[in-house]
Amino acid sequence: QNFFFILSFLSLIFSFWVTFKILDIRVKKLSFLIYILLALVSFPTRFTFGMGQNNFIVLPLILLSYYFFQNDKKELSGMFLGLAISFKTIFAFFLLFYLLKREWKIFAYSLLTILLSVLLTGGLFGWSLYSFYLSEVIPPLLNLEGREIYYNQGIFGFISRIVLDIGLRRIFGFVLSTLVGLTTIILSLKKRNTIYQFSLFFISLLLIDSLSWQHHFVWLIFPFVFLSQTFLNRRERALLVLLTFSYLLVSWNFKVIPDVRFASFMVLSHVFIGTILLFILNIKLFFKKDI
């Protein structure tokens, strides 16, 4: 357990390092430490460490995939993407990012890496592991009952706290998820700096996933660093205030669920609201004429 904690902590630091390499920023040591501290005090980080989740171990893999894509090393990009998906299948969402860029080589290498990972895992640990995953893990993900639990902070969690009827949950959740997904796809097709689009994919993933647990929101490290550095460089004080508010909403946690009768669904969806705000701030950059 101690080894896993140390590995996760080192992966957290490495994630920031790769992020600054992607952004091509030589950050001062003090600024780097402040970012680390802000990550450590947030609840998603503490939740990840406490639950023994591999979120921080996987994050550098998806970041390295983009870093090598950025540096035209497509084979390595595809391999790291495949490794990330092998650890967290939900990161298959990023295959869409590269497909929209028509990066067929990255797509092919990622699929090859996934195939090799499946064969290696099945050969070493037996195929019953995949049978269990398909029969016991996947089916509950398609069931929308219990999605209103506080720790679920995606679109479906938010909708489930408002709508009791399972059928309506599915409809409203699908409509909102489609809206977020289409917005992300349309903006990713534009010939802009791909960093903006890559950042948007992180945010969209957490909104669309039907089970976005609070510990998953550590993956917002890249969008938060990217937007904060962009707003600082542009001296966008108002946007920095909104970004800070977004961070506070995402980082907060109620140890005791408050008994709030008025707009309780809003209070209990603070991470979702903070992520939506982050989504809007990221989109706002697409409409800046000088970017």
Please give the residue ranges for each predicted region.
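Transmembrane helices and adjacent periplasmic/lumenal helix-loop junctions
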Residues: 81-98, 209-216
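Aromatic-enriched
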Residues: 228-291
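Residue-level detector of transmembrane insertion/anchoring sites
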Residues: 45, 78, 93, 270-274
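Transmembrane alpha-helices and membrane-interface helical segments
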Residues: 14, 60-71, 98-101, 221-234, ...
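Primarily membrane-embedded glycan-assembly and transfer machineries that use lipid-linked glycans
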Residues: 1-76, 101-217, 221
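Alpha-helical transmembrane segments of multi-pass membrane proteins
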Residues: 43, 205-206, 225, 247-251
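A cytosolic-side transmembrane-helix exit/cap motif
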Residues: 55, 78-82, 128-135, 218-225, ...
